[in-house]
Each structure stands twice: as structure tokens, then as C-alpha cells.
Amino acid sequence: MEDLAVEVRGSNGAYYKGFVKDVHEDSLTVVFENNWQPERQVPFHEVRMPPLPDIKKEITEGDEVEVYSRANDQEPCGWWLAKVRMMKGEFYVIEYAACDATYNEIVTFERLRPGNQNKSVTKSSFFKCTVDVPEDLREPCSNENVHKEFKKAVGACRVYFHAETNQLIILSACESTVKRVTILSDMHLRSIRTKLMLMSRNEEATKHLECTKQLAAAFHEEFVVREDLMGLAIGTHGSNIQQARKVPGITAIELDEDSGTFRIYGESAEAVKKARSYLEFVEDFIQVPRNLVGKVIGKNGKVIQEIVDKSGVVRVRIEGDNETKLPREDGMVPFVFVGTKESIGNVQVLLEYHIAYLKEVEQLRMERLQIDEQLRQIGMGFRPSSSRGTEKEKGYATDESTASSVRGSRSYSGRGRGRRGPNYTSGYGTNSELSNPSETESERKEELSDWSLAGEDERESRQQRDSRRRPGGRGRSGSAGRGRGGSRGGKSSISSVLKDPDSNPYSLLDNTESDQTADTDASESHHNTNRRRRSRRRRTDEDSSLMDGMTESDNASVNENGLDDSEQKPQRRNRSRRRRFRGQAEDRQPVTVADYISRAESQSRQRNLPKEPLAKGKKEKVKDVIEEHGPSEKVINGPRAASADKALKPQTTERNKASCQDGSKQEAILNGVS
């Protein structure tokens, strides 16, 4: 600001040093040295330029000079007009001209100068230029040090930013300054913007340096994430990084995208580890036995999806046989999981537990199969064997007995046609297919031949009663399935289905009866129509039946009596009272291995008995059975104990085959008379 120095005349005639701040039409805005007076506007005629600094000081007696002095202690020094009266060495005696009274003073040569010959300034004494400043540069332009080089280049006396007009003011006493300002103004503003950006970067670098110094002494961890997993680590729009930065105690998180390196700084080790758990994504694999892959995946991927959801992994992939990226063990299939380290640990726990569970289930199933095989080999037991072809055809969570029942698997034993599904095991006391061991191969052949010759109506009548039999076996009791002692009344559900294959086979199960909850062996007391609830399995030509051998003789008996099936079918009497004649041995009891062994021994003893007494015993038993159907109905091979006080109605009883090895013909029983 020394270049803008002027001298302002005071009220006492002395000139005081000041600085021009702005130029107006007829005045100047002047700031006084040391601010001894406030800033004010001074007319041009009271302001003059100071003399040139290189002027020679040649002072003699009688010259008019200016003395640098002050009138009192409250005012600063100024240039007062005086006249030299006498000289003596370095000292001068001067007389002030501005004072009314004569005032002399002795001063040194340094306080004297020749009189200032400059006249008062005018409007043309100063040149003023303005430059508009962009908004982003207004703040930096307010610092006058920014314009230091620009001021020197244009030769200006002063350059400053005017906040009210948002302009850069350039003041100069030279006319050439105006042209230079026009040329350099744009360049000056660009340089300010560049310097501002560099200064900002330097400030950020300084702050980063200070922060790094602080973080160096704090907790930090560094880890690398694979390039293909970097997107998962960063998250959508950097969500994972933001979540990690919100962890209390985290001061900074740095990411080097080129190398995939994360650096986490925090105030505590716990905070750093927690933030790392959000960002560290890895890929790991778990070996799964090949035979358990399907069960680990589950139906429609339900099991593996549950494992993925609970563990929190991002995705799972099963390594193919043609892929050799991962090490593979014999009989194992790698499951590749992608996620955070915590989620990978969770999926390992879940998968290892599930595989252990599947192995235990497989072990139990194999033990079950071994037990069933032993039962079949020991005593022709009625335990069912699984007819499912391969392990892949069943779900691993399916119960063995239920699956066997659905598929209608056959029992291990080989005699008789009264076998049901696996749910109809020998859980009904002594009603097993081993209860009557007297049937021989010759009887089976005769039954098969008689069955093929029997009339269709009589087959239906016989089959209908068979459908009502309770599952259990081939015993003589009325509740036996399709054994020798089974009833022959009613129509067969199997025959009706064979007649009309397009009909609904489940319509046979529609009828119910009041005594449905009675004992299993009391099922013979139900009506013929309700006997369809439990139909037998479909017979083949190779299967033989006791009823087959009775078909011809029964048809003949009906024709001899002249009875028609549709006319003489009296209402059947409710025979549920028969259950009171049943022994306790026929109650349902769980079958054990000892039962199978005892039945096998009993069968072997009974096979040694003569065939003829057994045949006679059968005839005597049949005579005691009460049958309330017409002549076309067959007597059920039911309980031997019947009520003696009830009158016998005309009926057709069941004829029994004599199991003779010489192939003797069967005798028919008609109306209770052989």
C-alpha cells in the first residue's frame, strides 16, 4: 500500500500521510496511518502526491522547507511548512510559517526536506479498473496476497476485492495499467482457481497425514478380498462399507480397488473385527457323500434352501463331475458356498449335522432290513419286505411301513392269498396266515380250477364278503383276510372293479356301519354292502384260494334247490354276538420274533397230522355256522362256537375241501347237510 500513499492536508495546514482506498468522482477514500483518524472521503484539492523518494536534499539558509513535526502529543507527525533561519553543522534553526506567532525550533537534517512542489490531485491523477469475479472465486479473492503477482505484473498501485459489488478493483497512477488488466484478468482468475484446487488438495493431504499418524497408533486390520467377490464385499451402492463404518469405534476404512485390499482402523479390537465380518467375503467348499447328495438337496431344493437361509450364505454351487478346480475325494461331491466367514462357519455346522443325521437314518434303515431278512429266513414270518426297487425312489424322510403300505408290497410268507400290505402285519393275535397249516398244494390246484369254472354271480357274492374281512392272515376266525376260514357272502370288491375298470375304486369305502369299532374278528357281522370297505388285493391266475374249490358245488346246490339269487336272499342277521365266543387269544397283540418262531414250530407239527381227520374237523365246524343269506350265499368259515338256542334258517353253508394227497373231490354242504 506504500504505492498508494498520499498526503492529506489537515485543518492546521500540515500534511499527514494517508493511503488511497478508492477513487470517486470528486474525492478520494483515504485511510490514515496508524488509524489515528477514521477512514473518510477527502476532496481532491486537499490531497497531493508525496515527493519522489530519490530527490536530493540541498538546503541553505533562507530556503523554504518542510519539517516533520507535530503540534502536540495527541497528534501524529506531519509535514509543516517552515523557513531556515540559520545553519550550524548538522543543526538547523527553522521558523514555522503556519503559526500565527513566530515559533522557532532547532531540528536535525533528517527531519527536513525541500518543499513539496506537487499540486493537488485530480480525477485524472488515478486510473481505476474493475473485473467481475465468479462466485466460486469470491472467497479466495478477498485475500490480497492472492493478487500480489497480478498487481506487480500490471503495475497497479492497489488490487483488492470489493464485497458489495463482487468485483476486483485495480487502482493505478499509470494509464498502461488499464490495458494490462484487460489482457491478464482472465488468466489471473484461472490461476486463482488452479491454486485454490491445489491448496485444497494440500489441506486434505495434510489432514490425511495427521489422521494416518493417529491411526498408526490405533487398532487396525488388513485383508484381501478376491476380485470376483469385491462386488459382494462393497455391497449395493457401498451398503456394506457404510454399515461397517457405522460400527461404534471405527475411525476409518480404506479400500485399494486395484489389489482388493481393505484396511480397517478403529479404537478397539472388537470394533475392528466386527467391521471386518461385514466386508470379508470368501468361498469355501464342503465334501458331501455322493449317495446323500439328493437328500441334502431335498425335494425341489427345500433342504439346501433352508440351510442357505439359516446360515446367511450368498449362494451355493454343486461341483460337477467334469470340473476339477477343487480337490475331490472318492465318493464325495463338493458343495461350494460363498459368503462371509461367519456365514461359511454357520453352513458348515448345519451341513455336517444334517449329513450325520442322514447317516444315522441310513444305518437304522439297514438294521431294519437285516431284522426283516432274519425274520423271513427263520419262520416265514409275516413281516413285510420293502418292494421299492432302489433307494432313489423314496424320500429319505418317508416312514418304512408307510411307504410299503402305499406300494402294496407283499409279505415274506408264501402260503395262502390272505396277505395284505405291510400295515396288516400279524398284529391281531392268532389271526395269522400260519393259523391253518392244513392246506396242501393239491387243494390249491383244485381251488384254482374251481374258481375258473365258477359263475360270475357267485364269484361276486364270494368276493363281496371277502372285502369285509379284517386284515390279519388266513386263520379260521371270521376276521381273517382271504384265508381258508374266510366268509363267502356278498359281492367281491375286486370283481366289481374288474368288471368296470373305469369306475371309482374308492367308492367301495363309502359305506359305514354302527359297529365299525368292534373287535377285529367281529367284522363278519356287517352287511354285505359294507363288506366292500376292506377289499382284497387283486388276484392273479397263479394265486390259489380256498373259495375257488367251492364254486362249482355251490352253483350246483343252488340249481338243485331251484333257488334264484335275486329272489331268496334273506336279510342277514347281525352276528356281532359271535365275538363273545371268541377267545382272548384273538385280541390284537403286537407280534414279536418269538411269535414267528412259535408259529413256525406249530406249523411244522400240524403238517405231520393226517389230512383226513383235518378235513372231517372242517366239516363239523362248518355245520355250526349260521348263515342267513339265500342259497347262493356261502357260509363263512367263522367261529366254531354258535348259539344253540337259535333256529337255523334255510341257507347254503360253505363246503370244505378235503386235503387228501390222492386228489379226492370236494364234498358240497347244502343247507347244513353234507
Curated annotation (Swiss-Prot):
Source species of the chain: Xenopus tropicalis
Compositional bias per record (Gly residues), positions renumbered to this chain: 474-489
Region feature (Disordered): 380-674
A GO molecular-function annotation: protein homodimerization activity
Amino acid composition bias (Acidic residues), ranges on this chain: 512-522
Composition bias type Polar residues, residue spans: 423-439
Main location: cytoplasm
GO cellular component: cytoplasm; cytoplasmic stress granule; intracellular membraneless organelle; nucleus
Family: Belongs to the FMR1 family.
A Pfam match: Agenet
Name of this chain's protein: RNA-binding protein fxr1
KH domain segment(s): 222-251, 285-314
Known role: mRNA-binding protein that acts as a regulator of mRNAs translation and/or stability, and which is required for various processes, such as neurogenesis and muscle development. Specifically binds to AU-rich elements (AREs) in the 3'-UTR of target mRNAs. Promotes formation of some phase-separated membraneless compartment by undergoing liquid-liquid phase separation upon binding to AREs-containing mRNAs, leading to assemble mRNAs into cytoplasmic ribonucleoprotein granules that concentrate mRNAs with associated regulatory factors.
Signal peptide (UniProt feature, chain positions): none
Stored Gene3D superfamilies: 2.30.30.140, K Homology domain, type 1 (3.30.1370.10)
Residue ranges with Basic and acidic residues bias: 609-632, 646-657
Tissue and organ distribution: Shows tissue-specific expression during embryonic development. At stage 23, expressed preferentially in structures that will develop into muscle (mesodermal) and neural (ectodermal) tissue. From stage 37 onwards, highly expressed in neurons and skeletal muscle tissue. Expression remains tissue-specific in adults, being localized to neurons of the central nervous system (CNS), all spermatogenic cells of the testis and skeletal muscle. Within skeletal muscle, expression appears to be localized to costameres.
Keyword entries, A-Z: Cytoplasm, Developmental protein, Differentiation, Myogenesis, Nucleus, Repeat, RNA-binding
Biased segments, Basic residues type: 528-538, 571-582
Biased composition (Low complexity): 404-414
InterPro entries membership: Agenet-like_dom (IPR008395), FMR1 (IPR040148), FMR1-like_C_core (IPR022034), FMRP_KH0 (IPR040472), FXR1_C1 (IPR032172), FXR_C3 (IPR032177), KH_dom (IPR004087), KH_dom_type_1 (IPR004088)
GO BP annotations, alphabetical order: dentate gyrus development; membraneless organelle assembly; mRNA destabilization; muscle organ development; negative regulation of inflammatory response; negative regulation of long-term synaptic potentiation; negative regulation of translation; negative regulation of tumor necrosis factor production
PANTHER family for the chain: FRAGILE X MENTAL RETARDATION SYNDROME-RELATED PROTEIN, RNA-BINDING PROTEIN FXR1
